Structures are given as structure tokens and as C-alpha cells.
Design a protein with these regions (language model features):
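Sec-dependent signal peptide recognition
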Residues: 8-15
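C-terminal motif of bacterial Sec signal peptides marking the signal peptidase cleavage site
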Residues: 21-23
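Bacterial signal peptide processing site
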Residues: 25-28
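C-terminal functional module detector
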Residues: 30-60, 64, 68, 72, ...
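A metal-dependent hydrolase metal-coordination microenvironment
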Residues: 38-248, 260, 264, 273-281, ...
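Acidic/polar low-complexity surface segments
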Residues: 251-255
């Protein structure tokens, strides 16, 4: 869905008015020595390969679902497509640079039918010299590996987001540009069939705006269990989340000030990050009935806060928003479009709000009869569910450690209950139900970067949300 014009303008109008080196220890125990200084804020994300280890032969890769490019009519401050049909080159370069700076391994672009339906498929992949186009068995280009210049690449796929979201298209749906647009903007079984026939997974964006009846009646592979746009858009907050329209926007203001003693701009999410029960309520209503993968949608457009922050970057930059959270997918082999979609459809993934700290060591699986069942899999009653809470990657010894908690939830028809809790869980003789894990964190370690009002932002928050394991 993205920003309807009025919604986007209301948020933009509101926001537009507001326009240390680490000390080295000498190894002594002199009590008069000053405490060590915290590390400088790290603007660039740590590559996944350096942050997360394999588990049982499964390699974690991080990425973005639900991202817009210049081919969306409202992206790039509404200036993505230029007169004459060219695209906003500066915005396209922002996107290419940001996926590398945010250390993503993959990005599923999901543009609005207006204008992505009008362009040939390869154009949607932003292929440039030095990239590695990905081809299918017949030689057609289906994806692109953007080169980061340091040996890393980021896998880019095309897709669309309107009422439904096609994730990982391998070609356009058939027809003329007008016919394609009509399909991409559809919301019925024929739309789902056409998207899947073009190689895509079908997911529900903006779940907060869908009724339980709609979700129960619609065929899809996954659904958003968090959407960043919804969390801050005044109209969606009021109409779909039951929240104060402008409270989130107001909470951003301290991060926009050019005050070196103020909070770090990259931590702006902490100003308005809160539990949004509408997502869990809808997801949990579906899980007892059928398998549905939960994903987090960044929904970045680079179109809401063009003013520069004190780090010299616009407030809603691709890099900044992409750093806030990722979908972590567990792969058994090479990172390919097909492998990614297979793992996502299976539910072998989890959501991590990495701006609170990169989670290292998270694990959730089932053990039964000598076999291991991964997230998204099915076990029979009587097996053991195993969950291990993560720790923060490379903690700063000068900072106060975070407080971490973990709960294992059992979801049955009309009921979500705590089945176990603790940093290490082994639940034996698991009863039937859909089981999912939530890890929460109180980010004391971020205090050095939150300025003079740090207590306002250091609060118990969602950190990791697993996909379910189903026990029959």
C-alpha cells in the first residue's frame, strides 16, 4: 500500500518543521583512573558472515522485505520517475549504496504497480557494470547481485506491493503494461495465481488493515507482523492501531536536533518503537489453522523526512531505515532467489530488530526421535522444543550490559499462552499447538548514544520474533 498521498503529506508537513575515540586501558587497577570511554557509534552494519555463525549447517542471511525504489510512484520524494520516463539516478544510487552500507545479504524490492508495471523486468533490478545478473535455466535474468566494492554482493529481486505483495518475481505477470498493472493491483484468487506463476511468493502487506475474515479467506504465503510505515503514519496509527496519530512523529524530534549531546540519529526508532498487538492478534488467529510465515516490512520509500540530521544524512534514508531491523533467513546452501523463497515459505526465518543490538546465538528448533525440526516445520506431540536466547554481538565493555528475556508461546484456537520462559528452554512433551518465541531486550548498552534523556528510550522492547514450529 505505501503512503497514500494525503497520509504522506500529513506526516511530511509535520516533520518538515524540525528541520570520541575509545580510550585505551593501560591494564592497571588504579581506582583513580577514569572509566573507559564508550566506542564511537558504528554507522555501518557488521556483515552477516562476521556476525552470525551457522547452526546445524544452516547459514543465516539477513535482508529486507518490502522496500520501494524509484519505480514506485511515491518513492524518492515523489520524484522517482522523471519526465520522459527516466528514473531519479541520485535516488537509485542511494538505494544501491545503502543496501551495502546496511550489510544486507538480500533485498526483495516491492514497488507499486504505478510505475513498475510500465517498465521492462530487467530495468527493475538496477543492473550496472560490475554487478552479477542472475539467470534462470533458460537464460532470462531473474535477479541481480549488486557489487559492494569489497567482495560482498547483495541479491536484489523485483516485486510489487499494492493490496497484495509479490515477493521475488522472476518475470512480469503476462500482458501489456496496463494489463500487468491491473493484475498487480488486484486482490483476488486470480491475482494470487498470476503472481505465483511469475515465480513470486504472495504476502500480505499492512496486516494491521486486514480483517480476520479477509485473512482467513485469502491464500498467501506470509504476512507482515510489523510494518514500519504503519508504526509512524498518523492516519494508520489512529485508524488501524488505535494509537495517538502524532505521538510517534513527535517522539522523533529530539533525534533531529543538531545537538552533539543529543541522541544518535540512527537510534530514532527507539523514540517510537512499541508493541503493536494488532499484528500478533492477526497472526495468532491464523497459526492454529494453517502455516503462515511472519515477516517484518521496512516499507522504505525515502519520501517522508528529507531534512538532514546531524550525521549529514536525511532522516529517512534507505541506509538508516534498513539498519533498524531485518528478516534473518536460514539457508542450507548457496544464497539464490529460489533458496531464499523456499526458506521463507517454509518459515525458516525470524525477525530481528538489530538497531537494539545484533542478536548472536538465537536458536529455536524441535527434537523428536533423533531428528531435528527447524522453524516452520511440524512435529508430533511429545517432542522437545528447544530455544536459546541470543546475546548482543561484540558488546562494548565500557557499557552496561542489556537485560534479555525470552518466552516460548503456545498458540491454539482463540488463545495464546506462555508455555515456558528463560534464556534456555527445553520444553519436553510439547502439547499440540503452534509455538513461537519472542525475545525482549532492555538496551542499557545503548545509553552512551541516547543523550541527556536516555532513560526515556531505555525500556523493555521486542528484539527477536521467531516463526512457529507446529506440533500436531
Amino acid at each position: 500500500m505505501g503512503y497514500p498521498g494525503a497520509m504522506r503529506r500529513s506526516a511530511l508537513l509535520f516533520l518538515s518543521f524540525f528541520p570520541v575515540l575509545a580510550a585505551c586501558s593501560n591494564g592497571t587497577t588504579d581506582e583513580s583512573a577514569p572509566p573507559p570511554s564508550p566506542r564511537p557509534w558504528q554507522r555501518l552494519a557488521t556483515p552477516t558472515s562476521a556476525a552470525m555463525a551457522e547452526v546445524r549447517g544452516l547459514r543465516p542471511v539477513r535482508g529486507i522485505l518490502h522496500s520501494h525504489s524509484p519505480y514506485s510512484h511515491d518513492a524518492c520524494d515523489g520524484d522517482g520517475v522523471q519526465p520522459g520516463g527516466g528514473i531519479n539516478v541520485g535516488c537509485a544510487q542511494d538505494l544501491r549504496r545503502s543496501v551495502c552500507d546496511a550489510a544486507e545479504d538480500f533485498v526483495f524490492l516491492t514497488d507499486h504497480a504505478d510505475h513498475m508495471a510500465e517498465y521492462d523486468f530487467e530495468s527493475l533490478l538496477f543492473i550496472e557494470a560490475g554487478d552479477e545478473p542472475v539467470k534462470d535455466a533458460g537464460g532470462a535474468v531473474i535477479a541481480n547481485r549488486i557489487g559492494c566494492g569489497d567482495g560482498r554482493t547483495v541479491l536484489i529481486t523485483a516485486g510489487n506491493e499494492n493490496s497484495l505483495m509479490s515477493v521475488g518475481l522472476e518475470r512480469h505477470v503476462p500482458g501489456t503494461a496496463a494489463e500487468r498493472r491491473a493484475i498487480y493491483e488486484g486482490d483476488d484468487a486470480a491475482t494470487v495465481e498470476a503472481m505465483r506463476a511469475a515465480g513470486a511468493l504472495v504476502m500480505i502487506p499492512h496486516t494491521e488493515q486486514r480483517s480476520l475474515e479477509y485473512l482467513a479467506a485469502t491464500s498467501f504465503d506470509g504476512m507482515e507482523i510489523y510494518n514500519l510505515h504503519a508504526a509512524i503514519d498518523p492516519d494508520i496509527r489512529r485508524d488501524s492501531l488505535g494509537l495517538d496519530s502524532y505521538a510517534a512523529a513527535a517522539s522523533i524530534l529530539p533525534f533531529t536536533k543538531f545537538d552533539p549531546e543529543g541522541p544518535e540519529p540512527d537510534l530514532t526508532l527507539l523514540g517510537f518503537f512499541e508493541d503493536l498487538p494488532a499484528y500478533a492478534e492477526r497472526w495468532d488467529s491464523i497459526l492454529p489453522v494453517r502455516h503462515v510465515t511472519g515477516i517484518a516490512g521496512t516499507d522504505v520509500h525515502q519520501n517522508t523526512f528529507p531534512s538532514m540530521m546531524r550525521d549529514g544524512e536525511r532522516g529517512d534514508s534507505y541506509r538508516r531505515l534498513m539498519r533498524w531491523f531485518s528478516n534473518i533467513v536460514l539457508l542450507g546452501g548457496e544464497l539464490t532467489p529460489g533458496a531464499l523463497k523456499e526458506a521463507l515459505k517454509a518459515g525458516r526465518s525470524y525477525v530481528a530488530f538489530e538497531i537494539l543490538g545484533v542478536p548472536v546465538g538465537f536458536d529455536f528448533h524441535a527434537e523428536q526421535g533423533g531428528s531435528t525440526i527447524e522453524m516452520g516445520g511440524r512435529a508430533t506431540a511429545g517432542g522437545t522444543l528447544v530455544a536459546r536466547a541470543p546475546v548482543v554481538l561484540d558488546p562494548d565493555p565500557a557499557a552496561t550490559p542489556p537485560a534479555i528475556t525470552m518466552r516460548l508461546y503456545r498458540v491454539t484456537a482463540g488463545k495464546t499462552e506462555t508455555a515456558a520462559e528463560g534464556l534456555s528452554v527445553d520444553l519436553t512433551d510439547a502439547a499440540p499447538g503452534a509455538y513461537r518465541v519472542e525475545v525482549r531486550i532492555t538496551p542499557h548498552h545503548l545509553r552512551p548514544y541516547l543523550g541527556y534523556d536516555a532513560d526515556r528510550y531505555i525500556r523493555d522492547s521486542l528484539w527477536v520474533i521467531s516463526n512457529p514450529i507446529y506440533v500436531d
